[in-house]
Each structure stands twice: as C-alpha cells, then as structure tokens.
Amino acid sequence: MPEPKSTKKLHIVGEQVAAARGLLKMQQAELIEATGVSKATIIRFEAGGSVRPETMEAVRNVLEERGIVFTNGGEPGVKLRRKDADY
C-alpha cells in the first residue's frame, strides 16, 4: 500500500537536519527543546537512524519555521530561505 501523500512530503534525512542546524547556527539542545523530541532520538536521526513520522514532522516544522527549505532535487539538501522571498 503506498504511503499517504502528506507523509511523503515529510520525508527528510538526518544529514539534512544536521545541515539545517548548521545553517541556523542552532545547537542540538535548542532543537530538542523546540520539538520536545528526546536527545537520543535527535542524535539517532542525525546519525542516519529512522524516526517515527510524527517526530520527523515535528523536526521539519521547527526548522522550516526558522527559515529552512528542504530540497530533494537529485540529492537531499537544505537551504536558508531568503528573507525577501515569498514562499
């Protein structure tokens, strides 16, 4: 059975999360506090481990609220949204 469309949109990988934090100069502790996700889960996710869809969504939402844009054009990536861009 195929994944629901909304879940597919949420798929990000741990390398993207670590890169996004780097762009934002965000410490892991700040991401942990903002998402309510445990330290062990964030560490596992950034190291390439799997997480539940709700965890992925929480992490993605926090980073997107701070200006991160997740890209998947060929290879997963991240970029910082320009302040003057209309998305």
Give the positions of each predicted feature.
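N-terminal flexible/basic segments that precede or flank functional cores
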Residues: 1-8, 69-87
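Short basic helix-loop element that most often maps to the first helix and adjoining turn
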Residues: 16-30
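Conserved hydrophobic/aromatic packing and binding residues within compact polymer-binding modules
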Residues: 17, 31-32, 42-45
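Alpha-helical residues within the helix-turn-helix
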Residues: 22, 33, 47
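Recognition helix of helix-turn-helix/homeodomain-like DNA-binding domains
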Residues: 36-51
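DNA major-groove recognition helix of helix-turn-helix/homeodomain DNA-binding modules
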Residues: 53-71
